[in-house]
Amino acid sequence: MKILRGEEIAEKKAENLHGIIERSGLEPSLKLIQIGDNEAASIYARAKIRRGKKIGIAVDLEKYDDISMKDLLKRIDDLAKDPQINGIMIENPLPKGFDYYEIVRNIPYYKDVDALSPYNQGLIALNREFLVPATPRAVIDIMDYYGYHENTVTIVNRSPVVGRPLSMMLLNRNYTVSVCHSKTKDIGSMTRSSKIVVVAVGRPGFLNREMVTPGSVVIDVGINYVNDKVVGDANFEDLSEYVEAITPVPGGVGPITATNILENVVKAAEFQKNNL
C-alpha cells in the first residue's frame, strides 16, 4: 500500500515558481482579504504568506473586523485597477449576508487566483484553462506525480470549488468521470466501480473499505477537526492496509493547494505583464 504524500510535489512546484520569477524579473503580488477572525482562515492566510516569501511573491493580508458588502466591492474595484496587485483572494468563511460568488464576479478574471469567477470556470468547461481552482489542480498534481493517468474516477462532491471544476478538468485530460452527491442513491456502487476515488464531503471517516476495492486509489480532500486533530473524509486506519494507495490528511492534498494559489499568482502576473 502506497501513501500519496503531497509535500514533495509542493516543494518541486515551489522551486519551479521561484525559478520562473528569477528568470522573468516578475515581482508578483497577492492581496488577501479576510473579514472576521476565523482561526482556520488565519492559519491558511499565514501559510500563503510564508510560502509566498520563500518563492518570491509578496503576499499581503488585509483584515477587517467588520465591513459592508458595498464597501468590500468598492475595495475590490480599487484593487482590480491597481497594476501593482496581480491577484486578489477572499478568505473563507465570510460573515452571514455576504454573497461569495457576487464578490468573485467583481474580480477581473486575470486577478481571480481562486479561479471561481464565471469566466474562469467557463474556460475550464471549454477546455481552455487559464487560472484553475487550487484544490482540483492539487488532485491532478497527485495523479500526475504518481502516474495515475486516464483512469476511471468517481468524485464524491459537486461543489463549484472542488467537484464541478475537477470533473471538467479530468475530462479535459481524458479521464472517465462520475460525480456523486448527497442525492446519489448508492454512492458505494459508484466508488467501487472506479480506479480512483476523490472524496470531499466534510464528514470524518465517511469513506470506508465497504465503499472501495483493494485496487482503489483514494484521494482525500476533506479537512475535519476531531478531538483537536485534523482528519480527512476517508477512514485512514480502515483503508490504509486495504487499498492500493491513499493520501494522508494532513500531508496529502493540502500542501499542494497552498502552492497552487501562488502558481496562479505567477500565471496572472505573466499574463498582466504581456497583455495589459
UniProtKB/Swiss-Prot annotation:
It comes from the Archaea. InterPro entries: Aminoacid_DH-like_N_sf, FolD_Thplmales, NAD(P)-bd_dom_sf, THF_DH/CycHdrlase, THF_DH/CycHdrlase_cat_dom, THF_DH/CycHdrlase_CS, THF_DH/CycHdrlase_NAD-bd_dom. NADP(+) binds at N157, R158, S159, S182, I223. GO terms for molecular function: methenyltetrahydrofolate cyclohydrolase activity; methylenetetrahydrofolate dehydrogenase (NADP+) activity. Gene3D superfamilies: Leucine Dehydrogenase, chain A, domain 1 (3.40.50.10860), NAD(P)-binding Rossmann-like Domain (3.40.50.720). It catalyses: (6R)-5,10-methylene-5,6,7,8-tetrahydrofolate + NADP(+) = (6R)-5,10-methenyltetrahydrofolate + NADPH; (6R)-5,10-methenyltetrahydrofolate + H2O = (6R)-10-formyltetrahydrofolate + H(+). Keywords: Amino-acid biosynthesis, Histidine biosynthesis, Hydrolase, Methionine biosynthesis, Multifunctional enzyme, NADP, One-carbon metabolism, Oxidoreductase, Purine biosynthesis. Pathway: One-carbon metabolism; tetrahydrofolate interconversion. GO terms for cellular component: cytosol. The keyword Hydrolase applies. One of its GO terms (biological process) is purine nucleotide biosynthetic process. Its EC number is 1.5.1.5, 3.5.4.9. The keyword rRNA-binding does not apply. NCBIfam families: FolD_Thplmales. Belongs to the tetrahydrofolate dehydrogenase/cyclohydrolase family. Catalyzes the oxidation of 5,10-methylenetetrahydrofolate to 5,10-methenyltetrahydrofolate and then the hydrolysis of 5,10-methenyltetrahydrofolate to 10-formyltetrahydrofolate. Homodimer. This is Bifunctional protein FolD. It comes from Thermoplasma acidophilum (strain ATCC 25905 / DSM 1728 / JCM 9062 / NBRC 15155 / AMRC-C165).
